[in-house]
From Swiss-Prot:
Protein name (database record): Small ribosomal subunit protein uS4
Pfam families, A to Z: S4
NCBIfam families cross-referenced by the UniProt entry: PRK04051.1 (NF003139), uS4_arch (TIGR01018)
Role according to the record: One of the primary rRNA binding proteins, it binds directly to 16S rRNA where it nucleates assembly of the body of the 30S subunit. With S5 and S12 plays an important role in translational accuracy.
GO BP annotation list: ribosomal small subunit biogenesis; translation
Domain S4 RNA-binding: 106-158
Superkingdom of this protein's organism: Archaea
Keywords recorded for this protein, A-Z: Ribonucleoprotein, Ribosomal protein, RNA-binding, rRNA-binding
GO molecular function, one term: structural constituent of ribosome
A single cellular component GO annotation: small ribosomal subunit
Organism: Pyrobaculum islandicum (strain DSM 4184 / JCM 9189 / GEO3)
Length: 159
């Protein structure tokens, strides 16, 4: 009969422990500018997603080869379909070396800019938020939408 539960923040895994570390602040500022993020929470969300991937790869590495075999290929195929890795046959050690840029490169805002549909990364964000971008014929208004590899060439501008 109590009140509603407070929703859990999705970026806590990616939030740095020491937020006033000068080196970290400069690195975050550079990433926010390079990828046109609105605030650091978007960067922390990407870091949290990366942390989930690395944690899953680490747990697979800790298993015996017999336990790992049925779980490893689907995990790698999922990462390949999302575009985080270039080949589904890469070793798990390479997955551990992914960085946050791999996640940020798959955002709709970044892909719209990289394809040349926008003049700048900020223009790409505005196009997405205002509903001028469609992915596979469906309007997407979230610049943080992670575009799978098979939908990457189906991004179009709509009026």
């Amino acid at each position: 009969m109590g009140g509603l539960k407070k929703p859990k923040k999705k970026y806590l895994e990616g939030k740095p422990k020491k937020i006033w570390n000068k080196q970290l602040l400069l690195e975050e500022l550079q990433l926010v500018g390079e990828y046109g993020l609105r605030n650091k929470k978007e960067l922390w969300l990407a870091r949290a997603h990366l942390k989930w991937i690395v944690r899953r790869a680490r747990s697979l590495l800790s298993m015996t080869p017999e336990e790992r075999a049925p779980l490893e290929l689907p995990f790698k195929e999922k990462l390949y379909k999302m575009g985080f890795i270039e080949d589904p046959n890469v070793p798990l050690d390479r997955i551990l070396s992914l960085d946050v840029r791999a996640i940020l490169e798959r955002r709709l805002q970044t892909i719209v800019y990289r394809k040349g549909l926008a003049k700048s990364i900020y223009h790409a964000r505005q196009l997405v938020v205002h509903g001028h971008v469609a992915v596979a014929g469906r309007r997407v208004t979230s610049p943080g939408f992670l575009v799978p590899r098979d939908l990457e060439d189906k991004i179009t501008l709509i009026e």
